[in-house]
Regions:
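Tandem repeat scaffolds
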Residues: 1-152
Length: 152
């Protein structure tokens, strides 16, 4: 399906299943998604301003490419086979989320909160990671990628 020239403002989507959707010239303003499934969604042509929150959602095969998503909320979400590429996520909150085969490429993750996440793997050579909060496991992966061995 293709949504074109649509605008949703102050909408709340609960227990929705949104699959195989392309968003062209699409606006989300102060929208909340709770307990939703988003699968096969291409958000590359979303319009701005764009403000939304996702709480306890499943995201599968969702591409966030060349987007400005500062201060977005992704609480307790499950990301599977997702891509964040050239996306500005500064000050976004991913607390309690799980990442499985999900990549961040050339994205700004400055001041993001990844507390209590699982499966997070961020390459510091291709992402901006200034002042981020990450779990110890993710920190060790970053150090290992940089050639730093932590041991006693």
């Amino acid at each position: 399906f293709n949504f074109r020239d649509c605008e949703f403002e102050k909408c709340r989507f609960v227990n929705c299943s949104i699959k195989n959707l392309k968003l062209n010239f699409f606006k989300l303003i102060d929208c909340e998604f709770k307990d939703c499934l988003l699968q096969g969604v291409n958000a590359a042509d979303i319009m701005f301003p764009c403000t939304f929150s996702l709480v306890n959602c499943d995201l599968r095969f969702v591409d966030f490419i060349s987007l400005r998503l500062q201060k977005s909320i992704f609480l307790s979400c499950r990301f599977r086979d997702c891509l964040f590429e050239e996306t500005d996520l500064r000050k976004s909150d991913f607390t309690g989320s799980e990442f499985n085969n999900t990549e961040f490429r050339h994205s700004d993750l400055s001041h993001c909160d990844f507390s209590m996440t699982e499966g997070l793997d961020i390459n510091p050579e291709i992402n901006r990671i200034l002042s981020i909060k990450i779990p110890q496991e993710a920190g060790l992966k970053i150090l290992k990628r940089m050639g730093v061995v932590v041991g006693g």
